[in-house]
C-alpha cells in the first residue's frame, strides 16, 4: 500500500510528515525548512508558494496569507486578476507540500491525513476535504489537531496510562482537548476552543500599537497604506518572536511612508511588558476553554498528568505563564509545537495502512445533535463530546390523528428549546398510514462518521419507508454561532446556579429560625437575658427580611442571627458543664470556678 502523508494545514505555517518504519518524520521543503509558510502569491502568471511567496509579500499585492481563516465561507480572494475560493488557495499550498513529499519519497503520493482545529464546523471540514481533492489528494481522514498532537506525543508511551491536556494555540485558531491514553487507545474525553483566536491576533495588537504611535507622532494613518501595512505585519511577527527570547526589541522600518517634508521612518522600542499589556485580553480568552474542557471531561486539575503545548503561539511567555497558572503544572516540552501535529497525522496514516499496530484513535463531536419534538423542544440524540464515529436511534410518533407526514428538523446546540439552537437541515417523511396520534412508529437515526460529517435518517417502522439527509457544507456552523451557543448555555447554567443558591438560602433561613426559637424557649428563666434578648432581636430582623423577600438582607441577617444564637448556645453549654463539675467535689469546684472565668470572657466577647 502506498504511503499516506500527514499534513498540518496551518493558518500561518504548514508541515508534512511521513511514517518511516515506526517513526514519524517531518519532510523538509526545498529550502531546507521543516515548516512552510501558508502563503501563496501570483507573479507573471506563476503561482509561488511558501518561503518565496512570503519574501515578496511586501512588494507583491497579489499575495494571499492566512487563507485558513476563510475556509468554510463563501468569501473569495482577488489576486492575479481573478477570484479564488479559500479551497483553491488551500489546494495550492497542499499541492506544494505534496510535491516535495513526492520528491523525498521518490514515488507518487495520492493519499493524505489532514488536520483541522477541533472546533472546525461541518463546512470547514468539508472545505478542507475539497481542497485536498483539488490538490489531487484523497483525504483518508480529517483529524483534530490536538488529537494528532497527542498521538505523536503518546505513541511511545502506549504502556502508560495518562490523562493529558493539549493546549493548541496556532496562527489563527485555539483548541483545548483532554485525552486519556492507555493500552494504545487515544480517547478524547472533551474538547473546547475558539476559532477566532491565534498568533495573528497577537500580531494585530502590535500593528495597532505601531499605527497609533506613528499617527500620534506624524499625523499619518499607516493602516490605509497596503504596502506599509504588510511591512508592519512582518515587523510585528518578528517582534513577537523576538520577545519570546528577550525582554526588549527594536522595530526599525525606514522609509515607511512620505510626509510633506519628505520620507518618514518608523523607529520604536517594544518591551515584553508592553507586549504583555497589549495582549492581556487575548491571553485571558485562553482560560475559558481550558475550564470548559475540564468540566466537560469531568476531571479536576489534579487528575491531569501532563500538559502539552502545541502551536507556535505557545512560545509567547505570557501564554506559558497563563497555562501554568491555570493548570498548576509545568508544561511538557518534549514535543516540537510546530511539528507535532503533522507527525501525529502521519501516524494516523500509518494506522490506516496497518503500519502502526494496536493504536486506536477515538475522537469526539464538539456539539450535541438532535431534532425538534412537540412543543418546540430540542431532543438530543447525540450529546456533545460523544466519541465518533457514532450512530444513535430513537423512536418517535405523530402529534395528531391521521397525520400523513412528519417534518424532521435537525439541530445542533446545547439549549433545551429548538428555536435557540442551530438548524442543520430539514426533511420530510411522507405517506404515513392514517392512524391515531402516538400509534405510528418513526425511527430517527443520527450517524456521524470519523470525519464529523452528519447524516440523519427517518424510517416508518410500519411501512419501512425511509428518508435520509446528509448535512451539506453550507449548513455548517459558523464560529460566531458556536460561540453564541456556548455562551448561551453558560449563561443559562449561571442562572440555574443562582436559582439553586436562592433555594438553599431560603431553606437555611427556615432552619435557623426553627433552631433559634427552640433555643430561646429552652433558656427561658436560666439567667441569660442579655444573650436571649440579642438572639431574639436578630431573629426578628431575619423574619422581617424573609417577609420582605430581600435576599441580600436575608443573607446578612442570617449571619447575624447565627452569631447571636451561637453565643446563647455557648452559655447554655457552659451552665450544663458547670453543674456537672459541681458534683465532682473540690476539684470539680475549682473547675467550676474556671468555668465562671470563661463566662466572664464570654460576656466580654459579646460586648
Curated annotation (Swiss-Prot):
Keywords: ATP-binding, Chaperone, Nucleotide-binding, Phosphoprotein, Stress response. The modification Phosphothreonine is found at residue 173. GO terms for molecular function: ATP binding; ATP-dependent protein folding chaperone; unfolded protein binding. Signal peptide: none annotated. Residues 598-607 have a biased composition (Acidic residues). Acts as a chaperone. HAMAP family: DnaK (MF_00332). This is Chaperone protein DnaK. The gene is dnaK.
Amino acid at each position: 500500500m502506498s504511503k499516506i502523508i500527514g499534513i498540518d494545514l496551518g493558518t500561518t505555517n504548514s508541515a508534512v510528515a511521513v511514517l518511516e518504519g515506526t517513526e514519524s518524520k517531518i519532510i523538509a521543503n526545498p529550502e531546507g525548512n521543516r515548516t512552510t509558510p501558508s502563503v501563496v502569491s501570483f507573479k507573471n502568471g506563476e503561482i509561488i508558494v511558501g518561503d518565496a511567496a512570503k519574501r515578496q509579500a511586501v512588494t507583491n499585492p497579489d499575495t494571499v496569507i492566512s487563507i485558513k481563516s476563510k475556509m468554510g465561507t463563501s468569501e473569495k480572494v482577488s489576486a492575479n486578476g481573478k477570484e479564488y475560493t479559500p479551497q483553491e488557495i488551500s489546494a495550492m499550498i497542499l499541492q506544494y507540500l505534496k510535491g516535495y513529499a513526492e520528491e523525498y519519497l521518490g514515488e507518487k503520493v495520492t493519499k493524505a491525513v489532514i488536520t483541522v482545529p477541533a472546533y472546525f464546523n461541518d463546512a470547514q471540514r468539508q472545505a478542507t476535504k475539497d481542497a485536498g481533492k483539488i490538490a489531487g489528494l484523497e483525504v483518508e481522514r480529517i483529524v483534530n489537531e490536538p488529537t494528532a498532537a497527542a498521538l505523536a506525543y503518546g505513541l511511545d508511551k502506549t504502556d502508560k496510562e495518562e490523562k493529558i491536556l493539549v493546549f493548541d494555540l496556532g496562527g489563527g485558531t485555539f483548541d483545548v482537548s483532554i485525552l486519556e491514553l492507555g493500552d494504545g487507545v487515544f480517547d478524547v474525553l472533551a474538547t473546547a476552543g475558539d476559532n477566532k483566536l491565534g498568533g495573528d491576533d497577537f500580531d494585530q495588537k502590535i500593528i495597532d500599537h505601531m499605527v497609533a504611535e506613528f499617527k500620534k507622532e506624524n499625523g499619518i494613518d499607516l493602516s490605509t497604506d497596503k504596502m506599509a501595512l504588510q511591512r508592519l505585519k512582518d515587523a510585528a511577527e518578528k517582534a513577537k518572536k523576538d520577545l519570546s527570547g528577550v525582554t526588549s526589541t527594536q522595530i526599525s522600518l525606514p522609509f515607511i511612508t512620505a510626509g510633506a517634508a519628505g520620507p518618514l521612518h518608523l523607529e520604536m522600542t517594544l518591551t515584553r511588558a508592553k507586549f504583555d499589556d497589549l495582549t492581556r485580553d487575548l491571553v485571558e480568552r485562553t482560560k475559558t476553554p481550558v475550564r470548559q474542557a475540564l468540566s466537560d471531561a469531568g476531571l479536576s486539575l489534579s487528575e491531569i498528568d501532563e500538559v502539552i503545548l502545541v502551536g507556535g503561539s505557545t512560545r509567547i511567555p505570557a501564554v506559558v505563564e497563563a497555562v501554568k497558572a491555570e493548570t498548576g503544572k509545568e508544561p511538557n516540552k518534549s514535543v516540537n509545537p510546530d511539528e507535532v501535529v503533522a507527525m501525529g497525522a502521519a501516524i494516523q496514516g500509518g494506522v490506516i495502512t496497518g503500519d502502526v499496530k494496536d493504536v486506536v484513535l477515538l475522537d469526539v463531536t464538539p456539539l450535541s445533535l438532535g431534532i425538534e419534538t412537540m412543543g418546540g423542544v430540542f431532543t438530543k440524540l447525540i450529546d456533545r463530546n460523544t466519541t465518533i464515529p457514532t450512530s444513535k436511534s430513537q423512536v418517535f410518533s405523530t402529534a395528531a390523528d391521521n397525520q400523513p407526514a412528519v417534518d424532521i428538523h435537525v439541530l445542533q446546540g446545547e439549549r433545551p428549546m429548538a428555536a435557540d439552537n442551530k438548524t442543520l437541515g430539514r426533511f420530510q417523511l411522507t405517506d404515513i398510514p392514517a392512524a391515531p396520534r402516538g400509534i405510528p412508529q418513526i425511527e430517527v437515526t443520527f450517524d456521524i462518521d470519523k470525519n464529523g460529517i452528519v447524516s440523519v435518517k427517518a424510517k416508518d417502522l410500519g411501512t419501512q419507508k425511509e428518508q435520509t439527509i446528509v448535512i451539506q457544507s453550507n449548513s455548517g456552523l459558523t464560529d460566531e454561532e458556536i460561540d453564541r451557543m456556548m455562551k448561551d448555555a453558560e449563561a443559562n447554567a449561571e442562572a440555574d446556579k443562582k436559582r439553586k443558591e436562592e433555594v438553599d438560602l431560603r431553606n437555611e433561613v427556615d432552619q435557623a429560625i426553627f433552631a433559634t426559637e427552640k433555643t430561646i424557649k429552652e433558656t427561658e428563666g436560666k439567667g441569660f437575658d442579655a444573650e436571649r434578648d440579642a438572639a431574639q432581636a436578630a431573629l426578628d430582623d431575619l423574619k422581617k427580611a424573609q417577609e420582605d423577600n430581600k435576599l441580600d438582607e436575608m443573607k446578612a441577617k442570617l449571619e447575624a442571627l447565627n452569631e447571636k444564637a451561637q453565643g446563647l448556645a455557648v452559655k447554655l453549654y457552659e451552665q450544663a458543664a458547670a453543674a456537672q463539675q459541681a458534683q465532682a467535689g473540690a476539684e470539680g469546684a475549682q473547675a467550676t470556678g474556671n468555668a465562671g472565668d470563661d463566662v466572664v470572657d464570654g460576656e466580654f466577647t459579646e460586648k
